[in-house]
């Protein structure tokens, strides 16, 4: 590995967005913006993907901690050079034609005597159509048809489940598991006792020793159903344990195929760390592989064709939005702040991975802006800022006035002004959607977030390790789930009256669980690198302090158990019956939680943009699917 040479950095003014006019010409500045965000390293460092900390001498002569984060991987010139033919009107017209044809398929399987209807498999046909359009990312076009299909299936549901057709007396595991998952996700009341009948005399799920493709598919649907369990559902927990072991064993025995790839994907990403667009890309690839090996039926062929066209049309929009994001990042002056992580492309990948509705560009772009500031503040409070500077910045945010910059060090002034301008701008955007002023919500979330970070900075400066409970209470806020969620969802075309917002925002159980899961999962992936940077307090170290004699493995096992329990509790908060707060109102906040969880699946995919992260950007944003 090469060693980076130590060379003085030339002074270069930071040009923040708030000093750019509407014509993109620099405004006259009353004061110069210092280059204190540029650091001269106090020692040579090895060029690698590690995040070990070193000290740095900033331009104001202050010795500072830095995280040695790798630079932005996505050059703005490269982003601006992206192009796609799929924005042409001919592709939109093709999509409209295919949408009409797929609606006709839905209608034909709903007709009492339609040619596609058989009394022995009509229920399974309805469920398969719903499952396919959702996994292929085209369900937004068929909400009415989905409701009709699920109502039809539910009308035949019994305490023993269902068979593939309405005339089939005996329920089967495949149709029951698929139906259970889809119906529960769409708000129908479902009881897990329906799976008790599939147990043998020993209380285990009964299945033959022959692993046929049909049986494996049944267990795969059982596994998918088990992932939306509630905390008290013992039979669902048993189903998850059984199906996980069964599918892992199946992967060792069946040949590499589209089925094996589907199993591997579902086992890897489960549900709570899955991104809908990644699932869509993966499922398109699976069906494309099937199409090369066998003749697809007419329904699947039409669905696949529409999915590919829709994927690529949105891909064209993604590239245009990403260009806007990259220009905003470049003009904001952020590239000159060398102590921060520049992950605007990764943030955009996350948000476009959870919301593929074309008309929601404002939501996606502003989500990136908020997350970018969260990252600046994270790196400023975690490493670069001194404790006295951070106290000044926290107090300035509470004042929420441009004049508050007078007491700030130079490098913080530009950050403060840009944060102030952006949060106010987003509040104005939210007013258009919500019809009321939401700035106070945003300010309170920001103040709470910075307060939690200041507390952690004080712990670092004093070497204090809190109790596990004290750490987690603070960590739920510093996880940034609330601040990353609140303002963006208020810009959606979805009303969030106060009674709905209080079910999602602080201090709701939903917000508490989402913040806790993110903090716990993040710590299990980051604690070793954080410790190398001098940050001793983590949920692992706090657990070990509370439990003398325990090992890191003990702590990780305990925390992973907490995460699994809290995931089931979050399932309930999302899916519980509530006429006043429908699932659709909570879904975006939940999906943001899924997206953030995704990047901590194996390691910290933000701080170190590893191969999984880069491949995700390529597969879901940069590349279209082959037509």
From Swiss-Prot:
Q: Which pathway does the record list?
A: Terpene metabolism; oleoresin biosynthesis
State which residue ranges cross the membrane. none
Q: Does the keyword Transmembrane helix belong to this entry?
A: no
**Molecular function (GO) terms listed?**
lyase activity; magnesium ion binding; terpene synthase activity
| Names of the cofactor(s) | Mg(2+); Mn(2+)
Gene3D superfamilies with a match to the protein in the record: Farnesyl Diphosphate Synthase, Terpene synthase, N-terminal domain
Q: What does the record say mutating residue 190 to V does? A: In strain: cv. Q903; susceptibility to pathogens
- Please verify whether the record's keywords include Transferase: no
Q: Which residues take part in binding Mg(2+) 3?
A: 530
Which residues are recorded as binding Mg(2+) 2? 378, 382
* GO cellular component annotations of the record: chloroplast
Per the record, the domain of life is Eukaryota
Effect noted on mutating residue 473 to E:
In strain: cv. Q903; susceptibility to pathogens
Induction and repression of expression: By jasmonic acid (MeJA).
Cofactor note from UniProt?
Answer: Binds 3 Mg(2+) or Mn(2+) ions per subunit.
Q: What class of enzyme is it?
A: lyase
Sorted alphabetically, the Gene Ontology BP terms of this entry are: diterpenoid biosynthetic process; green leaf volatile biosynthetic process; monoterpene biosynthetic process; monoterpenoid biosynthetic process; response to jasmonic acid
State its location(s): Plastid, Chloroplast
Q: What is its EC number?
A: 4.2.3.107
Keywords, in A-Z order = Chloroplast, Lyase, Magnesium, Manganese, Metal-binding, Plastid, Transit peptide
As its record notes, the protein acts as a catalyst of: (2E)-geranyl diphosphate = (+)-car-3-ene + diphosphate
For the ligand (Mg(2+) 1), the binding residues are: 378, 382
The chain's transit peptide is found over 1-36
Q: What does the record say about domains?
A: The Asp-Asp-Xaa-Xaa-Asp/Glu (DDXXD/E) motif is important for the catalytic activity, presumably through binding to Mg(2+).
Q: Which family does it belong to?
A: Belongs to the terpene synthase family. Tpsd subfamily.
Name of the featured protein: (+)-3-carene synthase 1, chloroplastic
Origin organism is Picea sitchensis
Gene label: TPS-3car1
């Amino acid at each position: 590995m090469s060693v980076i040479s130590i060379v003085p950095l030339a002074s270069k003014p930071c040009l923040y967005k708030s000093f750019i006019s509407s014509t993109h010409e620099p405004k006259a500045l009353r004061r110069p913006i210092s280059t204190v965000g540029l650091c001269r390293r106090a020692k040579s460092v090895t060029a690698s993907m590690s995040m070990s900390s070193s000290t740095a001498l900033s331009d104001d002569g202050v010795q500072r901690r830095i995280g040695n984060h790798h630079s932005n991987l996505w050059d703005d010139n490269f982003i601006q050079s992206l192009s796609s033919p799929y924005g042409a009107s001919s592709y939109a017209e093709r999509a409209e034609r295919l949408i009409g044809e797929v609606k006709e398929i839905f209608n034909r399987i709903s007709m009492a005597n339609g040619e596609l209807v058989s009394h022995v498999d009509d229920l399974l046909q309805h469920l398969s159509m719903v499952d396919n359009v959702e996994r292929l990312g085209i369900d937004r076009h068929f909400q009415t048809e989905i409701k009709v299909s699920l109502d039809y299936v539910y009308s035949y549901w019994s305490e023993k489940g269902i068979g593939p057709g309405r005339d089939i007396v005996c329920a089967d595991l495949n149709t029951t598991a698929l139906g259970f998952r889809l119906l529960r996700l769409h708000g129908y009341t479902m009881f897990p006792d329906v799976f008790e009948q599939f147990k043998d005399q020993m209380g285990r799920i009964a299945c033959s020793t022959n692993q046929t493709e049909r049986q494996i598919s049944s267990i795969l649907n059982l596994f998918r159903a088990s992932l939306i369990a509630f905390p008290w559902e013992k039979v669902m927990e048993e189903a998850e344990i059984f199906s996980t072991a069964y599918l892992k064993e199946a992967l060792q025995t069946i040949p590499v195929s589209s089925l094996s790839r589907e199993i591997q994907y579902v086992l890897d990403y489960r549900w709570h760390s899955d991104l809908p667009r990644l699932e869509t890309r993966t499922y398109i690839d699976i069906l494309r592989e099937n199409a090369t090996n066998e003749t697809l039926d007419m329904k699947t062929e039409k669905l696949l064709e529409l999915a590919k066209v829709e994927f690529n049309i949105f891909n064209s929009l993604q590239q245009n939005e990403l260009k806007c994001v990259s220009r905003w990042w470049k003009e904001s002056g952020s590239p000159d702040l060398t102590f921060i992580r520049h992950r605007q492309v990764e943030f955009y990948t996350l948000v476009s991975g959870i919301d593929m509705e074309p008309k929601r560009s404002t939501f996606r772009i502003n989500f990136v802006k908020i997350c970018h500031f969260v990252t600046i503040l994270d790196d400023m409070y975690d490493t670069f800022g001194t404790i006295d500077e951070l106290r000044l910045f926290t107090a300035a945010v509470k004042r929420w006035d441009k004049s508050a910059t007078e007491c700030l060090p130079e490098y913080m002034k530009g950050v403060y002004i840009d944060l102030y301008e952006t949060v106010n701008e987003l509040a104005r955007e939210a007013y258009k959607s919500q019809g009321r002023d939401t700035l106070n919500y945003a300010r309170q979330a920001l103040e709470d977030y910075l307060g939690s970070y200041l507390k952690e900075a004080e712990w670092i400066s004093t070497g204090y390790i809190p109790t596990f409970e004290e750490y987690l209470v603070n960590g739920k806020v510093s996880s940034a789930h609330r601040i990353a969620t609140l303002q963006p969802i208020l810009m959606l075309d979805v009303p969030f009256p106060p009674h709905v917002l209080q079910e999602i925002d602080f201090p709701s159980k939903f917000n508490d669980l989402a913040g806790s899961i993110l903090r716990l999962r993040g710590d299990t992936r980051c604690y070793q690198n954080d410790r190398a940077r001098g940050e001793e307090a983590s949920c692992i170290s706090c657990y070990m302090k509370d439990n003398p004699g325990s090992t890191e493995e003990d702590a990780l096992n305990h925390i992973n158990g907490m995460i699994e329990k809290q995931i089931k509790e979050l399932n309930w908060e999302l899916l519980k019956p509530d006429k006043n707060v429908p699932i659709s109102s909570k879904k975006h906040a939940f999906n943001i939680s899924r997206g953030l969880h995704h990047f901590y699946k194996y390691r910290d995919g933000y701080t170190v943009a590893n191969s999984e992260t880069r491949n995700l950007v390529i597969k879901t944003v940069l590349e279209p699917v082959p037509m």
